[in-house]
UniProtKB/Swiss-Prot annotation:
FAD binds at residues 15-20, 127, 182, 373. Keywords: Cytoplasm, FAD, Flavoprotein, NAD, tRNA processing. This is tRNA uridine 5-carboxymethylaminomethyl modification enzyme MnmG. HAMAP family: MnmG_GidA. GO terms for biological process: tRNA methylation; tRNA wobble uridine modification. It comes from Streptococcus mutans serotype c (strain ATCC 700610 / UA159).
Amino acid sequence: MTHEFTENYDVIVIGAGHAGVEASLATSRMGCKTLLATINLEMLAFMPCNPSIGGSAKGIVVREIDALGGEMGKNIDKSYIQMRMLNTGKGPAVRALRAQADKALYARNMKHTVEQQENLTLRQSMIDEILVEDGKVIGVRTATNQKYSAQAVIVTTGTALRGEIILGELKYSSGPNNSLASVTLADNLRDLGLEIGRFKTGTPPRVKANSIHYDETEIQPGDKKANHFSFMSKDEDYLKDQIPCWLTYTNQSSHDIINKNLYRAPMFSGIVKGVGPRYCPSIEDKIVRFADKDRHQLFLEPEGRETEEVYIQGLSTSLPEDVQKDVVHSIKGLENAEMMRTGYAIEYDIVLPHQLRATLETKKISGLFTAGQTNGTSGYEEAAGQGIVAGINAALKIQGKPELILKRSDAYIGVMIDDLVTKGTLEPYRLLTSRAEYRLILRHDNADLRLTEIGHQVGLVNEERYMRFQIRKNQFDNELTRLSSIKLKPVAEINKRIEELGFKPLTDALTAKEFMRRPEINYAIATSFVGPAAESLDEKVIELLETEIKYEGYINKALDQVAKMKRMEEKRIPKNIDWDAIDSIATEARQKFKKINPETIGQASRISGVNPADISILMVYLEGKNRSRTR
């Protein structure tokens, strides 16, 4: 078929949520003429659910996006109302930053960034069809029958893809927050031969701030110590007048109301068909699944400085409106709360992610990428992380440059993408620190050291940012070298000072670095013996030094495991391999290999249902093929 295109682009991004924004900013900043199409301009970077960015594992993802040259970290640093570092009483591997957002300001700032970006066109438009010829993307068609050409299309439609809102017995076609659903495009993706799944998520009621009895709840203030998501943010800009959140709980009365009305709950009446999130269940689901618990935590989270709306985190529900009101009024502090919005569930289509490569390009159609909730994940941060990777790879493909594949040892983003494309997901996927086997080297404090070089190589990290990164890296490297070379000897004067501090004296000579491995010895104490660095060090560099030194043994073990896995990842599997020609592998392994088509031995080894014997047989088969080709 011959198409008459009215406009020509390098990349078209469908959907302007958190994935779409990062994808379009990446492609345009890498020099590709990009169209970002959204059903509603007012929904750009909107937060239809929780008004927050970051949290366990997710906060590290935001730091990774920032290190690659993305926008989420910079934007939340300009629009938060509260900032907290989580898990400070635990080890460095699980510490993560979380910000309470002014959601309107966040969306407004991001829209301004997109509007000012060179090479990027922002347009309110419903995309109904992805145009494909000979297995390759050539463009899109809009609902108004305009056709735009493109070498790559990135689908980031979120929960709008055949979205349906469910509230009690009411069910209607809708995207998030009562925006339009994308139905024709959902049909088109299925017609293109992609396997489609159906997921569900939900959101809680919002109540009016001035109707809450805060004196009956527990205050949750922000941190006084400055922290930021972006490495470009400055401590002097850290917000002093932060807005607190508040903690309350459900009680037996709340549970009784829910239990009496379970027959009216769409979750249990059969109205909800989609699979919901395991780690963010609705309140009615929690009451049933955890019947032994007499209360559940609820956090009252302000949605911004210029709104009275307060989000009740932990009370996600699709119960009928009258039941929601009764539940809200049964909660301490909310007895007279005015409900401004009801909670609801939303069902939506997803592209089953085993059909994707680690670049987030579909295996079936060249130039077609998907990212975000379209791939079955939950969360703004997971979406943004996929968005920037899809955007980078779309641009690299068009430019004829090597693709970017983030490994599990590179980033939490790499862990997430590998999980999705290798294992798939049967429920909305959420990143957890427990999913990362190398979490001690995937920390909040070293994201820039891990990924800024990559961001610079692909063209997303500018020279100012790169210079600041090099200064920080040089400070770290130089001071680590210095601490590794200076020795403390067990002489009387030094041991006297150590004993005066209440610590055990030295019995052998130690380097300053070895001295710092003692749990009680921090950088300040160590340098009081060996002298300060040649230049004043940033506090964050000092914290990084302490972590790297104190956990060096564990970090080195992790790096040894990474080296072993790297050898597995370097053993590539031919695209045209005949899985049926391999004798002796288990039937389940053969079926999984056919479904997923792993690209490396490492990826094949991580597929569920595949055992070490199957991998050994596969490696022997490939080695035999290689020998026969070299004869």
